[in-house]
Amino acid sequence: MKYDLELNAAIGQFKQQNITDLVVDLRYNHGGMMSSAINFASMLVPNLSTNKVFSYTEYNRNYTDYFNSSSFKSNYPNENPFSDNFATTIDLPSPKTDKFPVQNIGNSLQRIYFLTGDGTASASEMVINGLKPFLPCILIGDTTVGKNVGSTLINDEKNTKNQWAFMPIVLRYFNKDRQSDFTKGFVPNYYIEDDFKHQLGDINEGLLAKAISQITGVAQASAAKAPIVHQSWKKALPYKAEHHFLIVKNKATDLYINRTK
């Protein structure tokens, strides 16, 4: 994806500066492409190697049987659907597959500060979980959603009039230590309410200010508490967006669908 390359370029600038601490703001990131999660984590892991496991995947019975079948193994002899390793290149499909070297800063990083919220979910949590075994990850903000499962898209592609599809939960993912115990979300090391008083990126914004104080060792100046804009930021969303989020959050701990009917 284009944004993977843009992120890679930004990390490349940090690499030139030999940074030791990184702040990653995931508080409004509901997730996305697994490939992007792998690419991003590959930019941050120490001693990057394609032999290192980023995540393991456990599927429901139907998918497990299929991936273990002789037909799958004969058709895809080089595929391992049960684990994903870190990547040294970002592969973008085009008329031909283009490969771009990953800009990795893992060997200079001492720790990562993740700014989190109750909207941090799925692939965002996957990045946190996947990096935890390799370097210190400090969370600042609110507890994350706790979506350690994944789905697959099912629709009737042959029917041109079809406008419906569904995405059943069919897998759970783990980090390299086989840890996946965050169905109630990652609890932050430092709980701080979201700061609606300051713009994102403002060094006085509550969560970022806390991260900076942890990096510099200089206590953040006390400030007047930001006014409460909403009881919940989700209530400010359009109905469809809020409804979509609630579906993700409420179904996050539902396990595998094994029925064939």
Locate each region found by the language model.
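Short strand-turn motif at the edge of the Rossmann-like AdoMet-binding core
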Residues: R27
